[in-house]
Amino acid sequence: MVIMYNLLTKQEIQLLSLIEYLYDSKEKVPMQVLRRKYEFSHYNINNLLNQLTLLISRVNTHENVHIRIINNQQSIELVADENIPIELMKEAVVRGSLTYMLALDLLLKRYTSAKDFCEEHFINFSIFKQVSDRLNNHLARFNCYLNLKRREKICGNEKDFRSFFYSLFFISGTSLVPFLSKTNQAQLQNFIEIIKNRYPYFTYTDLRKLKLIMSIGLLRYQSGFTIT
C-alpha cells in the first residue's frame, strides 16, 4: 500500500493533520494550542482554516452531508454527525491535490500536455513543473517515469505500471470512486471498459479486483458509512 503523503504538498499534509486532530478532539480547541502543537504562525493558521472551510463546503455539496466548522477566533471546533467518517474529508484533500489529478489525467487519457493541464486548473507552468516533479518522484518507487517530450505520459514496464495504477486506489481507500456517479452502475462499467481497452495487459482478474474495489466504494458513499 502506498503512503498517501507521497503525492501531497507540505500544506496539504498540514491540512490533513489538522483535520485528524480536530476530529479526534471532538471539542473546542484553543487557537494557542494549535499554534503550539504545529508551530504555525497566525498567517498559516488562518490560511489552513480558509482551506478547511472551502473543503467542508465542497464535501457537504458533493457528498450530501452536513459538516461545519465553528471558529470564534479564540477556538475552533469541527462538528459532524457520528456516521460521517473522517476518510470522507481526507479523501477530499487527496482528490483536490494537483499531483493526484495529473496522475488521473495520465491514467484515464493516457496523454496530457502541460498547456492543457495548466489551462484546466488555472495554474502557471512553474506550478505544473513542481506537480510533475512530485509525481515523477512518486513514480520512481514503481520504476516508472514521466515522459515529458511534447505530451506527458507515464512510462514503465507492464508489471510496474499495474502496481502504480493499483496504488492510486489505496491512497485513501477507494479514492477513484467519487469521480464516478454514485448512483449509476453503468458509469462504473464504462470505467472498467476504458481500463480494459486502454491497458490490454490488465488481466481478467485485475479487472474483477478493480470492479470489486469500486463497487464497495460506491456502496460506502451511498450509505455514508465506512466499509473496511
Predicted regions and their residues:
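A cross-family "folded-core" feature that marks the main globular domain of proteins
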Residues: 2-228
